[in-house]
């Protein structure tokens, strides 16, 4: 793995974890005594691990994909920003109430080209999770995002967004400060921006909280990300009065990238490294960068009127199959 976080495993990954633990154990033996040659056994186990990983991830069901989208080691927005962009300068505050740490954004360069990048940001440690409010923005977060988008429009900069949220924060304070209005305003204003907008779901795409920075000319999803109006647990609690039916709900909700591509609600699926994005941050970031560059190339040739018409039609088509 290319990051420093200790790997965590989901239950369906445990057989893979056991093999990887054996490999590490053998390596520690050879490190302690160079006279012991275990290279052949290590190579055999590595081959077996690769085969098992490929088999496991070849046919994940919707519930397993949902859990992959929330994987604690999964790369977040700032992980991608540091690998895809240069000269990132974070901008803070909505100029009305506060700076919401659940949304990050600022100016950056993409292969030398100035852009505006915005995304949801979750935390890893308990302290950071609280600081980022578990990736659930309040109204001031969406107003900050809109402020940055309007700035990008003034300076004719493409806008790139990364979506990864369980949803907008549902607290009383957020509602009092106009959560629904902030989301609705973003939907309206994003549909009229006259610069290219590229959106990518990198983890969870939770309802209006995701859509509030997701109205774009190109909408992509990582292979093991999800996009839905409600979480599987929430859907199960409503329909079956039990969150234990979450796996059933996930199957019928059509929240996976492959299903949404079939419904023509997204443009592209970005393939993840074997075992998921959390196993190879750098490789995943490079694949996503190439997708963004390709999308920008496609959008650069379109005039403002075409951009606006296509984006508006996409928004109006949501909800129709």
From Swiss-Prot:
Major location category of this protein: cytoplasm
GO terms for MF: acetyl-CoA carboxylase activity; ATP binding; carboxyl- or carbamoyltransferase activity
Cell compartments where the protein resides: Cytoplasm
Domain of life: Bacteria
EC assignment: 2.1.3.15
One cellular component (GO) term of this entry: acetyl-CoA carboxylase complex
Pathway(s) per entry: Lipid metabolism; malonyl-CoA biosynthesis; malonyl-CoA from acetyl-CoA: step 1/1
Stored Pfam families: ACCA
Swiss-Prot/TrEMBL keywords: ATP-binding, Cytoplasm, Fatty acid biosynthesis, Fatty acid metabolism, Lipid biosynthesis, Lipid metabolism, Nucleotide-binding, Transferase
Enzyme class: transferase
InterPro entries referenced in this protein's UniProt entry, alphabetically: Acetyl_CoA_COase_a_su, ClpP/crotonase-like_dom_sf, COA_CT_C
Catalytic activity: N(6)-carboxybiotinyl-L-lysyl-[protein] + acetyl-CoA = N(6)-biotinyl-L-lysyl-[protein] + malonyl-CoA
CoA carboxyltransferase C-terminal domain sequence ranges: 37-298
Keyword Lyase carried by entry: no
Subunit structure: Acetyl-CoA carboxylase is a heterohexamer composed of biotin carboxyl carrier protein (AccB), biotin carboxylase (AccC) and two subunits each of ACCase subunit alpha (AccA) and ACCase subunit beta (AccD).
Family listed: Belongs to the AccA family.
HAMAP family: AcetylCoA_CT_alpha (MF_00823)
Free-text function comment from the UniProt entry: Component of the acetyl coenzyme A carboxylase (ACC) complex. First, biotin carboxylase catalyzes the carboxylation of biotin on its carrier protein (BCCP) and then the CO(2) group is transferred by the carboxyltransferase to acetyl-CoA to form malonyl-CoA.
Protein name, per record: Acetyl-coenzyme A carboxylase carboxyl transferase subunit alpha
